[in-house]
Amino acid sequence: MGQGWTVGFAKKPPSVHAWVMPWAIFLLLGVTVFRCIRPWVGGPENFAPLAALALCGSLYFPRPWNWVGPILALFVSDVFLNLHYGLGPITGSTWMAGIAYLLIISIGNGFAQRRSWPIWLMGSLGATFLFYLVTNTGAWWTLPGYEKSFAGWSQALTTGLPGYPPTWTFLRASLVSDLLFTVLFVGGVEWSVRRFPGKARPILSAATNR
């Protein structure tokens, strides 16, 4: 007889938000800094934890931080990066990303009552494709380099504009980062509340395997 994790999530106790909030603030700051320093530390484009944060925030963050936190992290880091690249503080891509993250937050809110690892990992994949579709459709609609036709839209979703990496490579990086950070965020909180059981009960349930 051994101990293992079930795929189900246990009922969330009221005390978990009070305990997680300092950790959530640290996480929001970490995500913002991570995104700001990426041009200097390198790594693939679109390898960022924001989509995972938007998805998982509804599970752990109290309202209104479940949506204010990810959107604030987006705008703060976008202002920094846009100014670094010589652009305006807020660009069209910032607004499109904001719309995508709000939709992802809505997915997370819907999944908050369906607490299981398979559901949330599938939600992570769905969030990746949703962000990719919304932001690249916005680029197709606003950038003059794309023909305003189905062929131009297909180009925006696959090869992108000449002189830039194909857009499908951004999708690949997003898939990896969203899955990775979803597991890290959820796993980190669950490990913490089990490591310090006097603070709050874990949301993921522990079970006995026979």
Regions found by a protein language model. Give the residues of each.
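Juxtamembrane membrane-interface segments at transmembrane alpha-helix termini
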Residues: 57, 61-65, 79-87, 133-136
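Structural signal for the C-terminal ends of transmembrane alpha-helices
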Residues: 33-37, 56-64, 103-115, 188-196
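Interfacial aromatic-anchored transmembrane helix boundaries in multi-pass membrane proteins
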Residues: 35-47, 72-110
